[in-house]
UniProtKB/Swiss-Prot annotation:
Lyase among keywords: no
Residues the entry annotates as binding ATP: 119-125
Role description: Cell wall formation. Catalyzes the addition of glutamate to the nucleotide precursor UDP-N-acetylmuramoyl-L-alanine (UMA).
Keywords of the record: ATP-binding, Cell cycle, Cell division, Cell shape, Cell wall biogenesis/degradation, Cytoplasm, Ligase, Nucleotide-binding, Peptidoglycan synthesis
UniProt-listed InterPro entries: Folylpolyglutamate_synth_CS, Mur-like_cat_sf, Mur_ligase_C, Mur_ligase_C_dom_sf, Mur_ligase_cen, MurD
Gene name, Swiss-Prot/TrEMBL: murD
Catalytic activity: UDP-N-acetyl-alpha-D-muramoyl-L-alanine + D-glutamate + ATP = UDP-N-acetyl-alpha-D-muramoyl-L-alanyl-D-glutamate + ADP + phosphate + H(+)
Localization of this protein: Cytoplasm
GO biological process: cell division; cell wall organization; peptidoglycan biosynthetic process; regulation of cell shape
One term under GO cellular component: cytoplasm
Gene Ontology MF: a single term: tetrahydrofolylpolyglutamate synthase activity
Family membership: Belongs to the MurCDEF family.
Protein name stated in the entry: UDP-N-acetylmuramoylalanine--D-glutamate ligase
């Protein structure tokens, strides 16, 4: 970890805990800052806060008292899930207190260069593929961080200059960066999302675009050339642009030609040898290839990963085949486009489990993708909205309380040869703390169903 002096004796408020808040508070404490942590969860139910108190860090739990900001803080590090219209954040900004997210701290202390990956969809898969490719080239040369793996600052604390940090980054995290500068930035795609958090689409796009704002001509920006919006934005960057495309023969960057994955007119390997199915995963593969080739990974090492990588947990993850049905866990489908992509990947009849946090979408965009859906099980805040679209499509719709209750209904409505797919098209936060918790609840419910039926 870089021994930076700028935080020594600085009065810092860490707002919101979870993993990233705990990491930020611990590191700030080590750097000599006077740290106060504020979290809404009551102290008695908050083991993270209890652990920080044992380190000598001041902890305030149970609410976010607005008057706390009158205590002369010089910096606020906020949990990325706390929106900028939160009263605490609004007051901090009004008082001209700098507000950052934990990834900014990670960059400041990191000795390792960062490969930062963002986008509406595909960032987890792309980050993971890049991580595997770099490690195939040189063992332990990549560390996973961000939304996947460990908090960015915790990884940065222990990373060395001969490693890379492969860091998945959300728009929430990128809104709070000032000096953050990845050596390689990746933008997989941009679609409409998180409009409950961002004021409008423009703010969302700009948050994603922040990933490259401090890059120089010595850095690289890997970007989806099939999206005109992103293509036009590249006129504003100082980084070297490396395009990728699933539809165009580019001649530079990564693309597909004559059934082969290409990079700068060089054949990397046959597309048919890639284990990951689906057009959406081709985007992820091409973005990963562009990064890997830029960092010196050989074609053989790249193809070894692509021929063996089965995908990311909770992302169209095959769970089990039982009673002739195949169960898939796509809990990470937290927006409509991700569910569209999942449905496109199946030819057999699908029993779809969907629903979750209401962000104001109508879900009409799912209608053309319901051709293969034979039954729809809905839950959460958006149950009525998604159910309405199912009824328009002429699908049998069943309303249940949660994912766990959806599994036995899905089994009852299915037949041998069918796909049972959890692909919610919504964030999990109305009922589950994370999409991982939701996905695990689904897989646990499948296990309980099998046990019950086979008694």
């Amino acid at each position: 970890m870089k021994k930076i002096e700028m935080y020594h004796h600085k009065k810092v408020l860490v707002l919101g805990l979870a993993r990233s808040g705990v990491s930020a508070a611990t590191i700030m404490h080590k750097l000599g800052a006077f740290v106060t942590v504020n979290d809404q969860k009551p102290f008695s139910e908050n083991p993270e806060a209890q652990g920080l108190l044992e380190q000598g860090i001041k902890v305030i739990c149970g609410s976010h008292p607005i008057e706390l900001l009158d205590e002369g803080f010089e910096l606020v590090i906020k949990n990325p899930g706390i929106p900028y219209n939160n009263p605490m954040i609004e007051k901090a900004l009004k008082l001209k207190i700098p507000v950052i997210t934990e990834v900014e701290l990670a960059y400041q202390i990191s000795e390792a260069p960062i490969v930062g990956i963002t986008g509406t969809n595909g960032k987890t898969t792309t980050t993971t593929i890049i991580h595997h490719m770099l490690n195939a080239h040189k063992e332990n040369s990549s560390l996973l961080a961000g939304n996947i793996g460990f908090p960015a600052s915790a990884v940065a604390e222990n990373a060395t200059s001969d490693q890379y940090i492969s860091m998945e980054l959300s728009s929430f995290q990128l809104m709070g960066v000032e000096t953050f500068k990845p050596h390689i930035s990746v933008i997989t795609n941009i679609y409409e999302a998180h409009l409950d958090y961002h004021t409008d689409r423009s703010e969302y796009v700009q948050a994603k675009w922040h990933i490259q704002k401090n890059q120089t001509a010595d850095d690289f920006l890997v970007i989806n050339w099939d999206q005109e919006e992103l293509k036009n934005l590249t006129k504003q960057t100082k980084a070297q642009v490396i395009p990728f495309s699933t539809t165009q023969r580019l001649g530079q960057g990564s693309y597909v030609q004559n059934g082969n994955i290409m990079f700068n007119d060089e054949v990397i390997g046959a597309r048919d040898n890639i284990l990951l199915p689906g057009e959406h995963n081709l985007e992820n593969v091409l973005a990963s290839v562009a990064v890997a080739k830029t960092l010196g990974v050989t074609n053989e090492e790249i193809m070894h990963v692509l021929e063996t990588f089965k995908g990311v947990e909770h992302r169209t993850q095959f769970v089990v085949e039982w009673q002739g049905r195949k169960f898939y866990n796509d809990s990470k489908a937290t927006n409509i486009l991700a569910t569209q992509s999942a449905l496109k990947g199946f030819k057999n009849p699908v029993v779809l489990l969907a629903g979750g946090l209401d962000r104001g979408n109508s879900f009409d965009e799912l209608l053309p993708f319901f051709k293969n859906v034979k039954a729809l099980i809905v839950f959460g805040e958006t149950a009525d909205k998604i159910g309405r679209v199912g009824k328009i499509a002429g699908i049998d719709v069943h309303y249940v309380d949660n994912v766990e209750a959806a599994v036995p209904v899905a089994y009852r409505e299915s037949a041998p040869g069918d796909i049972i797919l959890l692909s919610p098209a919504c964030a999990s936060w109305d009922q589950y703390r994370t999409f991982e918790v939701r996905g695990n609840a689904y897989m646990d419910a499948i296990g309980e169903l099998i046990e019950e039926v086979e008694k």
